[in-house]
Amino acid sequence: DIPTDVLLGLRKESGAASAVGRNAFSRYTESQIPVVGTVRAGYGALAFEEDYGKEYACVKDPENYFFLVVKGDSMEPRISDGDLALVHRQNTLDNGDLGVLVYGADGEGTLKKYIQRGNSVILHPFNPAYEELVIKGEELDHLYIAGKVVETKAKW
């Protein structure tokens, strides 16, 4: 355990605690991560744009992350229109993860809670005004996982 006053920088670290503290976070660096476009918090297009800027994030492997600007209100009250979603590039999600998913022949992209039940996947919005999307059978062949949402940032 690292004392609170050391974590807050009120006291210098010493002995074994200092080595543990440094090693625990040494793989994480604050990096500029590209904001590559927008994603619907609803059901719609996943739009990638060339130059949307950069945001800082503290991650282990910055080349495997990107930010998207959230559009829509289906993930309210936890994720709002205009928030930034930090996404880790990966093609699998665990049950209950928030993910950026592309679904359908038109390649509609969305940010939703991923729920797997038996042989179906449910894309769950937090906002009760929106319905869940249930994907099953051969429809699952048209579901692509772009990544896992690991953090969101609100802009004020």
Q: What is the role of each PLM region?
A:
Residues 5-81, 95, 105, 109, ...:
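Short, positionally conserved secondary-structure boundary motifs
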Residues 84, 111-113, 134:
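Well-ordered beta-strand positions in beta-sheet-rich domains
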